[in-house]
């Protein structure tokens, strides 16, 4: 296909310039580093909530079957965001603005979400989780487009085609961030005193479960807004 031919051409171009030269340009490309940071932090957050979800539903809310509702409140908002994101980006003329303000508003909405979680008001907690997810969801669907923009910027400013290596930040970010997030769930549960064989968990274990699923992702979401705010590409 033409897409495969284009990709092959890009890879050949990268080989022509040499791995060392291309890698040197890459590590000095601030946009590549920022997108890589976004990927790593995003997937740390994602895997924290994925790994801790069943524990939060079972031990904090007292009903393991709630995990299905939690999953839907995270999946459907992203679908809605993906439907509206192109319209918003076209209207504002900036992917960076849409992503930044989406995550900024999402972070603010995390405050009432945490409050209702502490009050164990499930309906309001789920409502704010859903709304929060809609605003944060624009970034999920535009990360690859962001890489494409950064790749184009690199070609314009350096004259070197390095699309293949630019896209490596996605796989690297997923593996590193996902690995850290998954491992952190186990480490922090153990640190909090969680006992897998116990039917009733200690107060410290419950608190850690709450933090893993709700508080830590909230804090990480705020952190993500920092690199997102600097992803407006300038030649």
Model regions and ranges:
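Helix-to-loop junctions at the C-terminal end of transmembrane segments
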Residues: 82-94
């Amino acid at each position: 296909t033409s897409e495969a031919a284009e990709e092959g051409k890009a890879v050949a171009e990268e080989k022509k310039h040499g791995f060392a030269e291309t890698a040197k340009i890459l590590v000095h490309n601030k946009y590549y580093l920022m997108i890589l940071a976004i990927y790593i932090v995003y997937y740390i957050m994602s895997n924290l909530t994925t790994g801790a979800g069943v524990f939060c539903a079972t031990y904090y809310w007292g009903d393991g079957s709630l995990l299905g509702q939690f999953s839907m409140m995270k999946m459907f908002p992203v679908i809605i965001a993906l439907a509206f994101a192109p319209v918003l980006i076209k209207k504002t003329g900036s992917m960076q603005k849409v992503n930044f303000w989406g995550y900024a508003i999402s972070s603010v909405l995390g405050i009432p979400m945490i409050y209702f979680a502490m009050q164990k008001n499930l309906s309001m907690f789920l409502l704010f989780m859903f709304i929060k997810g809609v605003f944060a969801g624009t970034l999920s669907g535009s990360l690859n487009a962001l890489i494409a923009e950064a790749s184009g910027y690199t070609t314009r400013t350096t004259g070197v085609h390095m699309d293949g290596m630019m896209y490596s930040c996605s796989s690297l970010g997923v593996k590193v961030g996902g690995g850290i997030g998954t491992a952190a769930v186990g480490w922090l549960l153990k640190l909090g005193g969680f006992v897998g064989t116990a039917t009733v968990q200690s107060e410290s274990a419950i608190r850690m479960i709450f933090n893993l699923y709700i508080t830590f992702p909230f804090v990480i979401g705020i952190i993500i807004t920092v690199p997102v705010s600097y992803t407006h590409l300038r030649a």
